[in-house]
C-alpha cells in the first residue's frame, strides 16, 4: 500500500475496490497515516442507486453481514468502504472521488465523499468539474 509524506501529513492511497477490505486499513494504521485518498470508478450510469452487487467474487470480509442486493451501491460505498472504515486506519480524514463521465461506452456513477472520525458527507451530484475540500 502506498503512503506519501505531504505537508498535510502522511497520505495513504487505496484504489477503488481496495477500500472495501479491512486488512488494508489495518496495514495503513501500521504506517501511521493521517489522511486517506480513494480514487474510484463506478461503472454504469445510475449505478449508485441500483442494488449492491456484493464483493464480485472476492471473499466477503468477516465483519460484513450484508448480502448482495440488501442495499444500494451508494449505501454500500458509504458503509463498507472508506467512509465506514476510516476509523480502522487511524486517519483523521479521507476522501473518495469517483471519476465521472463517459469512459468508452460504459458510463459512470458515484458521489464523491469526505469522511472523518465523526462521519461523512456526500458531495453534490452536479455535472462538471469541481473542487472538494476538507479543512483540517
Regions found by a protein language model. Give the residues of each.
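Hydrophobic, structured segments
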Residues: 12-14, 58
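CN hydrolase (nitrilase-like) catalytic-core segments centered on the catalytic cysteine
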Residues: 19-132
Amino acid at each position: 500500500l502506498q503512503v506519501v509524506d505531504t505537508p498535510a501529513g502522511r497520505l495513504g492511497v487505496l484504489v477503488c475496490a481496495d477500500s472495501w477490505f479491512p486488512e488494508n486499513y489495518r496495514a495503513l494504521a501500521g504506517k501511521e497515516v493521517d489522511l486517506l485518498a480513494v480514487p474510484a470508478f463506478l461503472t454504469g450510469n445510475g449505478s449508485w442507486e441500483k442494488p449492491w452487487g456484493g464483493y464480485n467474487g472476492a471473499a466477503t470480509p468477516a465483519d460484513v453481514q450484508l448480502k448482495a442486493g440488501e442495499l444500494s451501491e451508494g449505501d454500500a460505498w458509504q458503509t463498507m468502504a472508506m467512509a465506514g472504515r476510516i476509523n480502522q486506519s487511524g486517519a483523521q480524514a479521507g476522501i473518495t472521488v469517483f471519476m465521472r463521465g463517459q469512459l468508452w461506452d460504459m458510463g459512470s456513477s458515484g458521489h464523491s465523499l469526505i469522511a472523518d472520525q465523526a462521519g461523512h458527507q456526500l458531495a453534490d451530484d452536479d455535472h462538471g468539474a469541481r473542487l472538494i475540500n476538507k479543512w483540517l
